[in-house]
Amino acid sequence: MITVLRINHRPYRDKRITTHVALTARAFGASAILVDERDETLENTIRGVISNFGGSFSIKTGCNWIQEFKHFQGIRVHLTMYGRRINDVIDEIRNSGKDVMVLVGSEKVPIEAYEIADYNVSVTNQPISEVSALAIFLDRYFQGKEFEFEFRGRINVQPAERGKIVKIIPDEIECLDLLKKYGASEQLIEHVKAVEGLALKIAERCNADKRVIVAGSLLHDIGRTRTNGIDHAVAGAEILRSENIHDSVVSAVERHIGAGITREEAARLGLPEKDYVPETLEEMIVAQADNLFAGNKRLRLEEVLNIYRKRGLDSAAERIKELHRRISAIAGIDIDEIR
C-alpha cells in the first residue's frame, strides 16, 4: 500500500496543485493521501471524484506530518531534486514488500523530511513539478501496471479512438427514474426494491460491489416493461445498453434468470445463443436475491426449489441450490437466515 504525504500545503494558494497531487496519487495507484493543513474544500473535491469515478482512495487533511512520517511502519520516501536517482533505488523499494509513504513537498521542505526519510529520491536531479515527480515515481514503482487498475464508479470513461464514451452505474434514485421512464408498474417497483434490500445485506457479508448490487437489483426486471416472457432479461439488457449503463450492471440483468441459462438452453428457448450463467459475485447475488422473492414476498430456498421441481425444471433447481450454497459459503451464513 502506498500513502502520499503532502506537506507545506497552503489552502489559500496551493488548492489547485495539491488537488492535482491527490488526483495523480489516486489515478497512479496510491491508496491514500494525507495533507498537513486542514482543507475541507480539498477533501470534498477529492471525495467527489472518488464518489463519481470509483476506487478506494481516501484523503485526510490537518495531519501532523512529522508524526505521520516518523512513525510510519514501512518505507519512507521523500521526493526531492537533491536525492538519489530513482533508477538506482526503485527496485530496492519495490522488492522490500513493505508499505510505502511518499512525502511530496513544495518549496522549502524542512530538513526533518530529509533526516526521517529512508530514501531521498530524485527524478532527474532537476527542478520538476511535484505532480510529475509523483507520477513518475508511482509509474516506476508499479512498472506500468497502474494502467491496468480498474476504477468502477458512477461514471466510467471507456477507451475510444475518437469522441467520448461514458457508461454509468446509476444510483438508487437514477434507477427508479429509469424504471418510471419505461413505465414500470408499482408492483414491479415494490418487487425490485425488496430484491435490492436482500441483495445489499448479502453484499455486506460478501464484500461485493454495492454500486453494482444496487443498480443490478433495481433494474433486473426493467425488461418486464416490454415482455413478461423469459426473454425479459435480454430485453432489459438491451434497454440498459441503449441508456449507456455500465456492462457490469447490464450483465447482472442479462444473467439473473434462475441460476442462469446455458447456451444450449438459450437456443431451445429462442434466446440469442449465448451463455447467460452469472459469473461475477455481484451477478450471482442479484440472481439469488431475485430467486428468493415472489413479488415482494420472501421465500426460503426449499420453497423456490419446490416451485421449479413441480414445473419439471430439476436441473435448474439444482443450479439454484448450488448457487445458494456458493453464496452462503462466501457470506459465512446460510442466506436463508439473512432477513
From Swiss-Prot:
Please tell me one Gene Ontology term that the record gives under cellular component. cytoplasm
Q: Which PROSITE patterns match?
A: HD (PS51831)
Pfam families, from UniProt? HD (PF01966), Trm56 (PF01994)
UniProt keyword Methyltransferase present: yes
Q: Name one GO biological process term.
A: tRNA nucleoside ribose methylation
Instruction: Using the UniProt record, name the top-level EC class of this enzyme in a single word.
Output: transferase
Kindly list the positions annotated as binding S-adenosyl-L-methionine: 79, 105-109
Query: EC number(s) of the enzyme?
Result: 2.1.1.206
A GO term, aspect molecular function: tRNA (cytidine(56)-2'-O)-methyltransferase activity
Q: Does the keyword Transferase apply?
A: yes
Record's keyword terms, sorted? Cytoplasm, Methyltransferase, S-adenosyl-L-methionine, Transferase, tRNA processing
Query: HD domain location, by residue?
Result: 188-295
| Catalytic reactions of this protein | cytidine(56) in tRNA + S-adenosyl-L-methionine = 2'-O-methylcytidine(56) in tRNA + S-adenosyl-L-homocysteine + H(+)
What subcellular locations does the record give? Answer: Cytoplasm
InterPro entries per the UniProt record, alphabetical = Alpha/beta_knot_MTases (IPR029028), HD/PDEase_dom (IPR003607), HD_domain (IPR006674), HDIG_dom (IPR006675), tRNA_m1G_MTases_N (IPR029026), tRNA_mtfrase_aTrm56 (IPR002845)
What is stated as this protein's family in its record? Belongs to the aTrm56 family.
The protein's job, in short, is: Specifically catalyzes the AdoMet-dependent 2'-O-ribose methylation of cytidine at position 56 in tRNAs.
Q: How does it assemble?
A: Homodimer.
- According to UniProt, the name of this protein is tRNA (cytidine(56)-2'-O)-methyltransferase
